[in-house]
Amino acid sequence: EFFIHYLRKDGPDKWEKSEKVNSTQSFYTLHGLQPGSQYRLKIDFNNTKWEQEIQTAGARVMEVKSGFVTESWFIGLISALVLLLLVLLILCFIKRSKGGKYSVKEKEEGQIDSEARPMNNEAFGEYRSLESDNEEKRTASQPSLCEDSKLCTDDGLDDYANSNSVQTEVIMDESLASQSSGVRDVPDAETQESSPLNPATAISHHGLPNSAALLD
């Protein structure tokens, strides 16, 4: 009995051996070989060594080499990262939805304030414009009023002076007329004794002189 050792040339560098083979067998089928591959066969029997390379028949099957991608720890790590990313996305979505509500509310309040502020500014501007217009009208009307009042005052003073002069002339005319009539109406010496030549005996009627004398 003996064993057949075989090695795949394009495979791992590891010799494998078959089951026990009886030397009386005329042929033996070696199982577990890949089709379309080259193998090295080696037989050791009673100090006899035999070695040969063979090519298996059939189409070669492409094998996927195992690496760290197929390892369980790598798959677990990728799954944990995906789960963590999903949790972060959910938290960001919740925060964004809350922030959107607050931002909309603040935006509405800002619009209300901005709408109210221009109205106040416009009303204040209109109030100031009305005040400025009133002041301009007042300043424009004051000189004219002053001029009119000045003219009225000047006219009033002229009228007052004219009326006073007229009254003075009338009073003077009346006094002169009364004096001249008193001089003409003197009948006797008694009247002459009470004339202005004798002031002690002068008699006045109603505050007006009865006679007038011309003194040289």
From Swiss-Prot:
Residues 127-149, 173-216 are annotated as: Disordered. InterPro entries: FN3_dom, FN3_sf, Ig-like_fold, Neurofascin/L1/NrCAM_C. The keyword Nucleotide-binding does not apply. Residues 95-216 are cytoplasmic. Its main location: membrane. The keyword Metal-binding does not apply. It is found in: Cell membrane; Cell projection, Growth cone. The chain crosses the membrane at residues 74-94. Glycans are attached at residues 22, 46. One of its GO terms (cellular component) is plasma membrane. Residues 1-64 form the Fibronectin type-III domain. It is a single-pass type I membrane protein. Expressed in many postmitotic neurons in 16-36 hours embryos. Little or no expression in the olfactory placode, the anterior lateral line/acoustic ganglia complex, the posterior lateral line ganglion, late-developing hindbrain neurons and some Rohon-Beard cells in the spinal cord. Pfam families: Bravo_FIGEY (PF13882). GO terms for biological process: cell adhesion; cell differentiation; nervous system development; positive regulation of axon extension. Keywords: Cell adhesion, Cell membrane, Cell projection, Developmental protein, Differentiation, Glycoprotein, Membrane, Neurogenesis, Transmembrane, Transmembrane helix. Residues 1-73 are extracellular. Residues 128-139 have a biased composition (Basic and acidic residues). Belongs to the immunoglobulin superfamily. L1/neurofascin/NgCAM family. Cell adhesion molecule with an important role in the development of the nervous system. Involved in neuron-neuron adhesion, neurite fasciculation, outgrowth of neurites, etc. Binds to axonin on neurons. This is Neural cell adhesion molecule L1.2. It comes from Danio rerio (Zebrafish).
